[in-house]
Amino acid sequence: MFAVELLERLGLPTIYLWIGFVLVVLLAYPTYFAIYNLYFHPLRKFPGPLIARSSYIWYAKNWIGGRWPHALSDLHEKYGQVVRIAPDELAFSSAQSWRDIYGHSVKGKKYFRKTDWYAGVGDLPNSISTEPDPQKHSAMRRVLANAFSNSVLKGQADVINKYLDMFVSQIKKHDNPNGIPVEEWFNWLTFDIIGDLTFHESFGAVENARTHFWIHLIINGNFIRSLYPIFQKIPISRLFMKWIIPNMDEIRQQRREHIAHTNSKAMKRANRDDIVQKDFFSFLLGKEGADTSEMFLTAQAHTLIIAGSETTAVTLTAMVSFLLRYPDKMKILIDEVRGAFTDKSQINVEGTLPLEYLFAVIEETLRILPPVPFGLPRTCPGAVIDGHVVPEGTIVSVSPYTASHDVRYWHDPEGWHPERWLPSDHPLHNPVFDQDNKEASKPFSTGPRVCLGVNLAYIELRMTLARLLFEFDMELLSKPVDWNTELDFFQFWKKVETRVKFTSLH
């Protein structure tokens, strides 16, 4: 080897020769890698920061640093609607790219398969959210689709109302001059609801007015899940995580405990034969020929609990925070809610549907703060995306946060304006928003892999916010936070303390 021969001529001992050789290799490989990526890679023509086009450093720094949605949005503002964010990855932000990447495979459109980013958790098999094979995913979706249909969810309103009644009662009991941290309380509510709908058994968080230990396990476990993309792109990074994150072993143990507890809950539910009101497991277990193995059921339960809790909780917290920052908009919604209902029993799935301003508040909050703000990566089969020829094997995605903040599609995209979602015949309709391209906002994705729980999310958001405004006046006690720019992101948004004083009206 030339490098070793060169070092031998210097008359150094053998050990130093090999140390020198290793150092040469360590320097030569990244140099070669960077030169290839910049000048010879099939994606070399796409714009982006030098450090992102040549290596994974930009990706790792911003993903681990908690500012991913904001950093990516800044890149699109600088470079345009397609940006190279890693040597093998492109990020898009156009409305058309939503359809090109995630849309249904019709009229010759090729299928964009999920990447290894979605690999199953631990020893669990793939679930409905992580399965990359389109045929296997379709089979899973057929099993669960009926569970999330509007007709079935309408029948689950009693479950939601049971926890809303308990939630309201606990607010009245525990409210004090210092208020209550609604970001924590909304977690209790959404975890209890999804726990009951999945396992026919809640976590008891609302009833006991404290965070169930499993909720802690889930939230903390999500942090290590957020590191998986870095481990995949830079395998050697696993060796350094203990130094970067000193409590990594503790976090990993919590992740294992979470999976074990999920398995225990799933098997307990699977072995029950006294269920009258159908829950999600009723559909998993009731489909003839469906996979009912222990690990499969655990994987589905893991996905259902995570997807149906934290995402809804952060949206509820953000809505309340925005409304309390803008009293004029809060008054409009209060008037709509209290003008529509005279009794809490009227606040149900159908009763909240006609409330147009409530719908607008929800949609605008989801636009400003998509619960899953990062782009869901897909492998390009070799296709044209929004006019760009993208080579086969390229990782591509659209960031919901970036697309919903793009000045090309929105008037004052950084402002929170529920009015932009009102129909033209509404008294508060403002024509300044008529040119907004609402197709750019896809908080639940789109196409055949659109979030299965979208109907449940809207029902919970409508019923919870309407019920709180019917029951209480609210006052923000904590320091106002710009939810649009100040939140950090680690797999999910990291909520900030939002203390609210509630004054009961009934």
From Swiss-Prot:
One of its GO terms (molecular function) is oxidoreductase activity, acting on paired donors, with incorporation or reduction of molecular oxygen. The keyword Ligase does not apply. SUPFAM superfamilies: Cytochrome P450. Heme binds at C451. One of its GO terms (biological process) is biosynthetic process. It is an enzyme of class 1 (oxidoreductase). Keywords: Heme, Iron, Membrane, Metal-binding, Monooxygenase, Oxidoreductase, Transmembrane, Transmembrane helix, Virulence. Its EC number is 1.-.-.-. One of its GO terms (cellular component) is membrane. Pathway: Polyketide biosynthesis. Its cofactor is heme. InterPro entries: Cyt_P450, Cyt_P450_CS, Cyt_P450_E_grp-I, Cyt_P450_sf, Cytochrome_P450_monoxygenase. Belongs to the cytochrome P450 family. Cytochrome P450 monooxygenase; part of the gene cluster A that mediates the biosynthesis of botcinic acid and its botcinin derivatives, acetate-derived polyketides that contribute to virulence when combined with the sesquiterpene botrydial. Botcinic acid and its derivatives have been shown to induce chlorosis and necrosis during host plant infection, but also have antifungal activities. Two polyketide synthases, BOA6 and BOA9, are involved in the biosynthesis of botcinins. This is Cytochrome P450 monooxygenase BOA3.
